[in-house]
C-alpha cells in the first residue's frame, strides 16, 4: 500500500514538473509572436503596444494557474487516501467537515452532477394526524418557494392526514406538482411489533418500510420529516445522489448531539451507532439498490437482535437505521451537515454554519420545536415564520420551459376564465365565483366520533377574522359538534391558531372542526364557505346558522328531541329556529322563552331585521310563535331567509352569490323547490349580537353597480332554477316580478 502511494506521488510530481516546462515553452513561443522575447529586458526587443502585451501575458498566467490548481487538488486527494488507506473517511470537500473540525463547509467543492432541467424529483414524507398535517404545509411551502423542477410528493398518511392533504393539494392547484398517497394502516403490521418510546409513535417507524410502500419502479427518493424547513433549492440535494459510490445506498447527516455517545446522563445506554450516529430527518435513499440488498430483512434482523437487550427504541426509526449502519458502514454516504442543521436541546449545530449562505435545511427535531434553546434560534425562527405565514397563492407559478401534465380541473378552470368577458360590468363577480380557493380542512385537532345517533346535529357557520371573538360564546351556548369555515390569509390563520390554543374554552373542545379557506379575490365567498363547512360534517342533521347568532342554552338537546318527535328521518322538512336581535353588546341572555318574550316586550330584544329587512323573517309569523306550543308549518314567501335545521344531504348553497345579498334567500328557495316542509319550532330561538357593518354590505349600500350585478345574478339564478325544476319553479319568477 505504501509503495503504491509513493508511485502515485512520484507520478504526480513528474506531471507537475512537465506541466511547468510546457507552460514555459508555451510562453516562449507566444512571446515570439509579439516580436520579442519576454525574458529579455524590454529595451532589447521590439516594443509593440504595452496594453496588448500585458493582456496576453495575463491570459497565459491565468491558464497556468488554473492547471496548477487542478493538479494540486488531485495531489491532495491522493494524499488524503494514502493517510489511512480508506477513501470513505478522507476529509474531502464532498463529505463535509466533522463537527469538531474545520467550520467552513461552503459548497466550493469539486464539480458534481447537475440536475437536468425539468427532471422530476421525488420526495417522501410520513404524515399522520391534524398537527403533522399542519406542519407539513410549511415544509412544502419552503420547498416550492426555492424549487425549479417538477416535484412528486409521496405521502404515507393515516385517514385524517389523507383527507386534509388531498383536499389541500387539489384546491391549491400548483403546476408541476404530483401527489401520491399511501395508507399507513397497511404498513402498521410491518413495524407494530417494535416497542417505541418516541413521541412520534408508530408513525416514527414508517420510514423503514419505504422500499415496500413506494412503487417498485421508483429508484431513488428524498425522505423528509415534517419539521424540516428548506433554505435552498431541493434540486441541490437531489444532485448529491450523483456522488454515491457503487456501495452507498443511504445518504445521511451526522447526528449533531452526543446522544449516541452515551454521555448525556448517567447510565444512558443508546442504541449502537457509528461514532456520533446519523440523524434521519433528511435521508437520501437509493431504493433500487436497497431492494437488491434485501433491506427489509436486513433492518428486521438488526432490530430483533438489538431489541433483545435494548427492549425498545428511543428515537424511533433513527435507532434502527444507525444499528444497521454500525454493522454495514459502507452503505452510508455522509452528507455535509448543512443539509440537516438540527435544533434540539443538546445539538452542536452552530458548528455547521458560519454565515447565512451556509444554511440549506433546518430541522426542528425537538419536542419543544420553536421554543428550543439555541443561540441563533431567533434567526431560525424568523426564517420558519417567513414560510409559515407566506401566501401560498403566490406559489402557483408555472415552471418556465417545463411542460405540465394535463390536469382536467385546472384545464376546465382555465377555459372558464378565458370565456369571461372582461368588459362585462359584473366581471369581478363572475371571476370571484370561479376563483379556486385553497382549503385546509380540520386545521386543529378534531376528535368527535359520530355515534350511530340518527338525530344528532352539527352547528354550521362561517366567519372571518373580525368575528373571531364570537367563538368562545358560541361554544358556551352549544355543547354539540360544530363545523366552521374560516376565511383567512396564511398569516391570519396563524393568529387564529395562537388564539385558539391560548383560549381555555376553545382548547378544551375537541368536537369543533375549523376549516381554513384562504383569502383570494375582492369579495367574501360566503356560500363557498358555507358549503365547505356543510360538506365536512359527520352528523345526519345540520343547523345552518351565522356566526353572529348565539343559540339559546340547551338548543342542541332541544333540536335532537324535536328531530325525533317530528320523525324527520322519514320526511323532508326544514325546522326553523326563530331569530331575534339585540342592540346591546352586553346582554343578559334569556334562559327561556318566557324571559325572551319579556325582554321583547320591554324593547331589549327585537325580531331580527324588523326595521331593515322585514321580509327576510316575517313569514316565521312571530305573533303566532309567541303562543305556540307545537311546531307549525309556514309557506315560502319571496325573500324569506330563515335559519334552519335540515338533513346533511340538503342542496348546496349557490356559490355565484358572493359578498352581500341573496346568499341565504336562494338556498331557501331551492329547499322549497324540492318540496321541503317549513316547520317553525315553538320553543327554540337564537339572538343576533351587534357588530360593525361588514365591508361587503357597505359596498352594497354605496355602489349602484354592485346592486345592479346582484340583480343580474338573481335573474340568472331564476333561469337556472326553471331549467332544473321546470314548471314548479315558475312561481318564484312570478313572485319576483310582482315585487
UniProtKB/Swiss-Prot annotation:
It is a single-pass type II membrane protein. Keywords: Glycoprotein, Glycosyltransferase, Golgi apparatus, Manganese, Membrane, Metal-binding, Multifunctional enzyme, Signal-anchor, Transferase, Transmembrane, Transmembrane helix. It catalyses: 3-O-[beta-D-GlcA-(1->3)-beta-D-Xyl-(1->4)-Rib-ol-P-Rib-ol-P-3-beta-D-GalNAc-(1->3)-beta-D-GlcNAc-(1->4)-(O-6-P-alpha-D-Man)]-Thr-[protein] + UDP-alpha-D-xylose = 3-O-[alpha-D-Xyl-(1->3)-beta-D-GlcA-(1->4)-beta-D-Xyl-(1->4)-Rib-ol-P-Rib-ol-P-3-beta-D-GalNAc-(1->3)-beta-D-GlcNAc-(1->4)-(O-6-P-alpha-D-Man)]-Thr-[protein] + UDP + H(+); 3-O-{(1->[3)-alpha-D-Xyl-(1->3)-beta-D-GlcA-(1->](n)-4)-beta-D-Xyl-(1->4)-Rib-ol-P-Rib-ol-P-3-beta-D-GalNAc-(1->3)-beta-D-GlcNAc-(1->4)-O-6-P-alpha-D-Man}-L-Thr-[protein] + UDP-alpha-D-glucuronate = 3-O-{beta-D-GlcA-(1->[3)-alpha-D-Xyl-(1->3)-beta-D-GlcA-(1->](n)-4)-beta-D-Xyl-(1->4)-Rib-ol-P-Rib-ol-P-3-beta-D-GalNAc-(1->3)-beta-D-GlcNAc-(1->4)-O-6-P-alpha-D-Man}-L-Thr-[protein] + UDP + H(+); 3-O-{beta-D-GlcA-(1->[3)-alpha-D-Xyl-(1->3)-beta-D-GlcA-(1->](n)-4)-beta-D-Xyl-(1->4)-Rib-ol-P-Rib-ol-P-3-beta-D-GalNAc-(1->3)-beta-D-GlcNAc-(1->4)-O-6-P-alpha-D-Man}-L-Thr-[protein] + UDP-alpha-D-xylose = 3-O-{(1->[3)-alpha-D-Xyl-(1->3)-beta-D-GlcA-(1->](n+1)-4)-beta-D-Xyl-(1->4)-Rib-ol-P-Rib-ol-P-3-beta-D-GalNAc-(1->3)-beta-D-GlcNAc-(1->4)-O-6-P-alpha-D-Man}-L-Thr-[protein] + UDP + H(+). Gene3D superfamilies: Spore Coat Polysaccharide Biosynthesis Protein SpsA, Chain A. Residues 32-739 are lumenal. GO terms for biological process: protein O-linked mannosylation. Residues 121-396 are annotated as: Xylosyltransferase activity. Mn(2+) 1 binds at residues 225, 227. It is found in: Golgi apparatus membrane. It holds the Pfam family Glyco_transf_8. The chain crosses the membrane at residues 11-31. Pathway: Protein modification; protein glycosylation. GO terms for cellular component: Golgi apparatus; Golgi membrane. Binds 2 Mn(2+) ions per subunit. The xylosyltransferase part binds one Mn(2+) and the beta-1,3-glucuronyltransferase part binds one Mn(2+). Its cofactor is Mn(2+). Mn(2+) 2 binds at residues 546, 548. Residues 397-739 are annotated as: Glucuronyltransferase activity. GO terms for molecular function: glucuronosyltransferase activity; metal ion binding; xylosyltransferase activity. It is an enzyme of class 2 (transferase). Residues 1-10 are cytoplasmic. The keyword S-adenosyl-L-methionine does not apply. Bifunctional glycosyltransferase with both alpha-1,3-xylosyltransferase and beta-1,3-glucuronyltransferase activities involved in the maturation of alpha-dystroglycan (DAG1) by glycosylation leading to DAG1 binding to laminin G-like domain-containing extracellular proteins with high affinity and in a phosphorylated-O-mannosyl trisaccharide dependent manner. Elongates the glucuronyl-beta-1,4-xylose-beta disaccharide primer structure by adding repeating units [-3-Xylose-alpha-1,3-GlcA-beta-1-] to produce a heteropolysaccharide. Supports the maturation of DAG1 more effectively than LARGE1. In the C-terminal section; belongs to the glycosyltransferase 49 family. In the N-terminal section; belongs to the glycosyltransferase 8 family. PANTHER family: GLYCOSYLTRANSFERASE-RELATED (PTHR12270), XYLOSYL- AND GLUCURONYLTRANSFERASE LARGE2 (PTHR12270:SF23). This is Xylosyl- and glucuronyltransferase LARGE2s. It comes from Gallus gallus (Chicken).
Amino acid at each position: 500500500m505504501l509503495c503504491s502511494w509513493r508511485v502515485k506521488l512520484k507520478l504526480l510530481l513528474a506531471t507537475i514538473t512537465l506541466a511547468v516546462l510546457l507552460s514555459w515553452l508555451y510562453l516562449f513561443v507566444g512571446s515570439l509572436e509579439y516580436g520579442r522575447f519576454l525574458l529579455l529586458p524590454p529595451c532589447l526587443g521590439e516594443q509593440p503596444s504595452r496594453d496588448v502585451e500585458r493582456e496576453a501575458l495575463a491570459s497565459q498566467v491565468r491558464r497556468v494557474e488554473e492547471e496548477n490548481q487542478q493538479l494540486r487538488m488531485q495531489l491532495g486527494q491522493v494524499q488524503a487516501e494514502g493517510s489511512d488507506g480508506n477513501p470513505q473517511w478522507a476529509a474531502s470537500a464532498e463529505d463535509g467537515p466533522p463537527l469538531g473540525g474545520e467550520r467552513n463547509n461552503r459548497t466550493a467543492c469539486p464539480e458534481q452532477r447537475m440536475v437536468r432541467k425539468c427532471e422530476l424529483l421525488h420526495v417522501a414524507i410520513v404524515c399522520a394526524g391534524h398537527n403533522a398535517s399542519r406542519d407539513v404545509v410549511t415544509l412544502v411551502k419552503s420547498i416550492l418557494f426555492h424549487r425549479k423542477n417538477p416535484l412528486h410528493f409521496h405521502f404515507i398518511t393515516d385517514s385524517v392526514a389523507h383527507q386534509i392533504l388531498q383536499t389541500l393539494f387539489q384546491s391549491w392547484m400548483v403546476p408541476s406538482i404530483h401527489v401520491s398517497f399511501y395508507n399507513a394502516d397497511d404498513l402498521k403490521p410491518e413495524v407494530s411489533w417494535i416497542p417505541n418510546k418516541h413521541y412520534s409513535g408508530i408513525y416514527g417507524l414508517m420510514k423503514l418500510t419505504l422500499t415496500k410502500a413506494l412503487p417498485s419502479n421508483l429508484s431513488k427518493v428524498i425522505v423528509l420529516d415534517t419539521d424540516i424547513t428548506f433554505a435552498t433549492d431541493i434540486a441541490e440535494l437531489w444532485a448529491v445522489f450523483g456522488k454515491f459510490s457503487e456501495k452507498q445506498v443511504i445518504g445521511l447527516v451526522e447526528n449533531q448531539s452526543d446522544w449516541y455517545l452515551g454521555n448525556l446522563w448517567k447510565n444512558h445506554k443508546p442504541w449502537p451507532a457509528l461514532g456520533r450516529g446519523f440523524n434521519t430527518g433528511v435521508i437520501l435513499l437509493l431504493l433500487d439498490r436497497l431492494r437488491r440488498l434485501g433491506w427489509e430483512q436486513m433492518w428486521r434482523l438488526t432490530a430483533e437482535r438489538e431489541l433483545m437487550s435494548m427492549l425498545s427504541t428511543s428515537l424511533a426509526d433513527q435507532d434502527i437505521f444507525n444499528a444497521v449502519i454500525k454493522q454495514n458502514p459502507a452503505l452510508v454516504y455522509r452528507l455535509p451537515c448543512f443539509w440537516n442543521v438540527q435544533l434540539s436541546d443538546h445539538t452542536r449545530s452552530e458548528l455547521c454554519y458560519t454565515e447565512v449562505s451556509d444554511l440549506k435545511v433546518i430541522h426542528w427535531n425537538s419536542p419543544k420545536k420553536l421554543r428550543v434553546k439555541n443561540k441563533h434560534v431567533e434567526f431560525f425562527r424568523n426564517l420558519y415564520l417567513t414560510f409559515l405565514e407566506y401566501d401560498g397563492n403566490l406559489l402557483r407559478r408555472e415552471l418556465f420551459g417545463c411542460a405540465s401534465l394535463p390536469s382536467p380541473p385546472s384545464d376546465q378552470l382555465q377555459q372558464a376564465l378565458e370565456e369571461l368577458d372582461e368588459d362585462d360590468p359584473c366581471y369581478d363577480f363572475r371571476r370571484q365565483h370561479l376563483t379556486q380557493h385553497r382549503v385546509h380542512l380540520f386545521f386543529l385537532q378534531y376528535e368527535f366520533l359520530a355515534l350511530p345517533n340518527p338525530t344528532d346535529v352539527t352547528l354550521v357557520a362561517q366567519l372571518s377574522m373580525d368575528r373571531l371573538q364570537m367563538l368562545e360564546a358560541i361554544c358556551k351556548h352549544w355543547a354539540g359538534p360544530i363545523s366552521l369555515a374560516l376565511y383567512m390569509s396564511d398569516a391570519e390563520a396563524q393568529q387564529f391558531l395562537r388564539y385558539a390554543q391560548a383560549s381555555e374554552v376553545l382548547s378544551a373542545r375537541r368536537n369543533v372542526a375549523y376549516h381554513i379557506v384562504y383569502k383570494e379575490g375582492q369579495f367574501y365567498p360566503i356560500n363557498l364557505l358555507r358549503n365547505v363547512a356543510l360538506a365536512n360534517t359527520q352528523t345526519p342533521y345540520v343547523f345552518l346558522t351565522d356566526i353572529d347568532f348565539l343559540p339559546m342554552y340547551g338548543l342542541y338537546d332541544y333540536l335532537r328531541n324535536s328531530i325525533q318527535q317530528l320523525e324527520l328521518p322519514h320526511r323532508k322538512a326544514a325546522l326553523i329556529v326563530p331569530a331575534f336581535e339585540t342592540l346591546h353588546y352586553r346582554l343578559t341572555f334569556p334562559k327561556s322563552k318566557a324571559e325572551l318574550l319579556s325582554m321583547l316586550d320591554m324593547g331589549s330584544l327585537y325580531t331580527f331585521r324588523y326595521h331593515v329587512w322585514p321580509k327576510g323573517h316575517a313569514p316565521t309569523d312571530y305573533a303566532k310563535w309567541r303562543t305556540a306550543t307545537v311546531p307549525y308549518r309556514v309557506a315560502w314567501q319571496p325573500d324569506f331567509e330563515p335559519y334552519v335545521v335540515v338533513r346533511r344531504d340538503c342542496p348546496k348553497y349557490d356559490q355565484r352569490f358572493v359578498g352581500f345579498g341573496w346568499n341565504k334567500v336562494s338556498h331557501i328557495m331551492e329547499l322549497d323547490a324540492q318540496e321541503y316542509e317549513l316547520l317553525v319550532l315553538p320553543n327554540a330561538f337564537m339572538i343576533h349580537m351587534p357588530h360593525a357593518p361588514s365591508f361587503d354590505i357597505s359596498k352594497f349600500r354605496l355602489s349602484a353597480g354592485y346592486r345592479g350585478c346582484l340583480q343580474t345574478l338573481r335573474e340568472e339564478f331564476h333561469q337556472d332554477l326553471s331549467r332544473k325544476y321546470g314548471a314548479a319553479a315558475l312561481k318564484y319568477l312570478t313572485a319576483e316580478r310582482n315585487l
